[in-house]
Amino acid sequence: MENIQIKNFIYDIATGYIKSYSLKVILELEIPNKLKNECNGYNEHGLYVLLRTLSTMGIFKEDEEIDRLFSNTEISETLINDTDKYPWVNDSYFQVTLLPYFKHIEESLKTGKAMGTFNSGYNDGFDFIDKEKNLKKYFHNTLTEYTRTQIDSILEIVDFSNFKTIVDLGGSQGESIKKILDKYHLNNSIIEKGINYDLKEVIENNEKNYKDNRYFEIMGNFFTDETFPIGNCYLVKYIFHMFSDNQVLEILNKIYKSIKSSYQNEVCIYIFDHIIYKNKKSIPISIEYHTINILNGGKERTLNEWNNLIKLSNFKIDKVSSLPNILCSFIKLSLN
């Protein structure tokens, strides 16, 4: 790299907040939607600066002949308020709203605590999401979209047909359990129940139009409930990276307490989460690691860290495998 390239590279990182805040504003004001009609009600020069800035990145296009005239591009079209067509936009919107909390990086570094949310008046990241009602929808839609992008790969790798009761802990909108029940009908499996377990406010807002009578939703809380719904298969998707080692062990211990009197060696836990592989660079995982650390004190783990953590529980690791997308791996646990 030449000095000028290094300079430009560092400058691009240093000014990244401009891009993020600009994206945040156009999403909040639904500018891509309004460009389809008319974009009135804003200061003309301020709007021009915003659109001009984003047009240099390919978001919006400035007319070559008419001054201050902009139109949508293929990129900005995806930001039009149609999350059924482009559901990943939920995550982009959620991410850019987190910008203010990153000003506490230095204090988090010094204290080892999630100061981003604490200094902003929240107990933790979940308290933040719960109280910021406008963000809650985007957060849970993001979790559902993560599931949708991975569930087909999961169903190809994992055979769920021999489990009687499958419990998805923190299952959000129930996408995983529904997909499993859709694949394994009563005539080709022994599945009697598929339970989606999540917070009261999540379950209450879920759609109630799924018809399979094996599907159940149960309200609860990882840390205030003494036990969880009883099953012989548990799914824990994108959950453990949001918590500290002690919190993960608390959840695993509650699973053990829930099943120890009902099942012996039949129980499996499938953890779907990130594994940090040092020889593979993943910008999305690194960014998400930074985010959950600032918001909630969570952590991404290397394979060695996963091994050491599980050894402290009543379970053992049977299998570790990567899904086709490097962003997700699965760890299969059974009772010791």
From Swiss-Prot:
Transmembrane segments: none annotated. InterPro entries: COMT-like (IPR016461), O_MeTrfase_dom (IPR001077), SAM-dependent_MTases_sf (IPR029063), WH-like_DNA-bd_sf (IPR036388), WH_DNA-bd_sf (IPR036390). The active site is at H241 (proton acceptor). GO terms for molecular function: 3,5-dichloro-THPH methyl transferase activity; O-methyltransferase activity; S-adenosylmethionine-dependent methyltransferase activity. One of its GO terms (biological process) is biosynthetic process. S-adenosyl-L-methionine binds at G170, D198, N221, F222, K237. Keywords: Methyltransferase, S-adenosyl-L-methionine, Transferase. Its EC number is 2.1.1.-. It catalyses: (3,5-dichloro-2,4,6-trihydroxyphenyl)hexan-1-one + S-adenosyl-L-methionine = 1-(3,5-dichloro-2,6-dihydroxy-4-methoxyphenyl)hexan-1-one + S-adenosyl-L-homocysteine + H(+). Belongs to the class I-like SAM-binding methyltransferase superfamily. Cation-independent O-methyltransferase family. COMT subfamily. This is O-methyltransferase 2. It comes from Dictyostelium discoideum. The lineage of its organism: Eukaryota, Amoebozoa, Evosea, Eumycetozoa, Dictyostelia. The gene is omt2.
